[in-house]
Amino acid sequence: MRTGIIAQKIGMTSVFNDKGERISLTLVKVDDCQVVGHKTLEKHGYNALVVGVKDKKISRVTKPMRQVFANAKISPKTKLKEFRISEENFIDIAASLEVDHFTAGQFVDITATTIGKGFAGSMKRHNFRGLEASHGVSISHRSHGSTGQRQDPGKVFKGKKMAGHMGCNQVTIQNLKIFAVDKERKLIMIQGSIPGHKNSYLSVKDAIKKISITV
């Protein structure tokens, strides 16, 4: 099990293959991604790499984290993430991770944060049909309707689908195929869409439910 990398979503584009089929691609950029630290089985109970990306002002880093970056002999990073690995896949601290960590034709899992929608009603958030447009219904056309039962239990159960905050959730999309890798521009072209807004950060790692192939 190898480490993943932290990348930045650039946007979407499309290309045509040899059959004339249009393929939607998401472009992610891998820039200044470095190994910050190690987590070992003997000391922490599991094997993992701590990966960081994007330089950060030293004045905005806490004193404990300053020492972590000083020990690694690298500049402070804005984004940090742990990736579980097998024992034989450790990489030296301060080593850089580039786009050639992945190859075209390989399948990957993408973890990202969805776009926040704010407070949303039940029709938008849960795809409810709403109430009738007429026949005695007034004011409450887009309401969710009844949420409880009677005096017993006399409450609304946790997890009930209702209006509330929508989006801004961590989501993992599995088995997305890498269309191409552009080492010169530091870009990975991934087939399909990826959660998150433009310039948001996401993690890319080998797919765990599909055997990757190189085309």
From Swiss-Prot:
It holds the Pfam family Ribosomal_L3. Methylated by PrmB. The modification N5-methylglutamine is found at Q151. Keywords: Methylation, Ribonucleoprotein, Ribosomal protein, RNA-binding, rRNA-binding. One of its GO terms (cellular component) is ribonucleoprotein complex. One of its GO terms (biological process) is translation. NCBIfam families: L3_bact. Part of the 50S ribosomal subunit. Forms a cluster with proteins L14 and L19. Belongs to the universal ribosomal protein uL3 family. This is Large ribosomal subunit protein uL3.
